[in-house]
Swiss-Prot record:
Pfam families: Ribosomal_L10 (PF00466). Keywords: Ribonucleoprotein, Ribosomal protein, RNA-binding, rRNA-binding. It comes from Streptococcus uberis (strain ATCC BAA-854 / 0140J). SUPFAM superfamilies: Ribosomal protein L10-like (SSF160369). This is Large ribosomal subunit protein uL10.
């Protein structure tokens, strides 16, 4: 192989390794068998959520994973592999791909990484069942509001009972 080609591939490995290091979550899938329409729909859904989705050669993925400290992921890079990277929302790629896989039998989740740790297919599917960041924040706020609301109701009840006595 010429030195120019080797340099270009090394640059690709570095670029993918940087994406892997920066990603909050990574989902690796086998998209073999998807129709063009299904693939386009999946890519559009991921793009709308700020998720980058690419088909990358397994040799480049394997070297990039090793370089990014995700050597445990190397077993996933067998057969056709497409990778979804999300830098912000940990749940988004897993949720979108898992939901899409329910309707498109050809899409198979292989595994991935969650916040820098290699994860199995089952871990990714469990992550997909969680609410997204906004959903979790709203759940947290409702939990925090409940005690305050109960105190307010108690104060109101005491005030009403004192009015009834007077």
């Amino acid at each position: 192989m010429s030195e120019a080609i080797i340099a270009k591939k090394a640059e690709q490995v570095d670029l993918v390794a940087e994406k892997m290091k920066a990603a909050a979550s990574i989902v690796v899938v086998d998209s073999r068998g998807l129709t063009v329409g299904q693939d386009t729909e999946l890519r559009r859904s991921l793009r709308e959520s700020g998720v980058e989705f690419k088909v990358i050669k397994n040799s480049i993925l394997s070297r990039a994973a090793e370089q990014a400290g995700l050597g445990d992921m190397k077993d996933l890079f067998v057969g056709p592999s497409a990778v979804a990277f999300s830098n912000e929302d940990v749940v988004a790629p897993a949720k979108i791909i898992n939901d899409f896989a329910k309707t498109a039998d050809a899409l198979e989740i292989k595994g991935g990484a969650i916040e820098g740790a290699a994860s199995s297919k089952e871990d990714i599917q469990a992550l997909a069942s969680l609410p997204n960041r906004e959903g979790m924040l709203s759940m947290l706020l409702s939990v925090l509001q409940a005690p305050v609301r109960n105190v307010a109701y108690a104060v109101k009840a005491v005030a009403e009972s004192k009015e009834d006595v007077a």
